[in-house]
C-alpha cells in the first residue's frame, strides 16, 4: 500500500509506516486502515487509507489467476466479515472476464471531506457524539464523478485534480 505520510499506529503501536510503499498483511493492514489519531486530518486520512487497502486487494486479486480461481474459497473464509451490495453474479462475471481477458485495472479514488464536530445524532439523540460533518461541495463533486462513471465515461487523473477541494 502507499502511505502519503510516515506514522506509528496509535491503536497498534508495534506497527510503523513509512511515507511511500509499505508491505502490509493481516493486522498491520488493519492498523493502517483504522488509524486516524496519528494523522493530521484524522477521519479524512482514515478514509483514504481504507480506499488504499481496497485498491491494494483488487490489484493483488487481479494479478493472480490462482487467487481468482479460488474466489469462492476466499469468499467462504470471509463470510460474516464483509458486506457488499454487489451481487455475487456480478462479482463472478468480473472474475470470469478478468480470467479470460487479463490486464490491469485503472482504479481511481476520490474522497469527500468533512470537519469533526460534537453533535446529537439520530442514533444518540440525547447526547453529543463525535461526527464528521461532510463538506457539501466535496459531496457534490463526488456525485458528479459517480454520474460520469454511471454514464460510461472514464474518470481521468485531471478530473480528480480539478474537483479536489481548494483547486
Where are these regions (language model features)?
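Residue-level signal for protein termini and structural transition zones
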Residues: 1-167
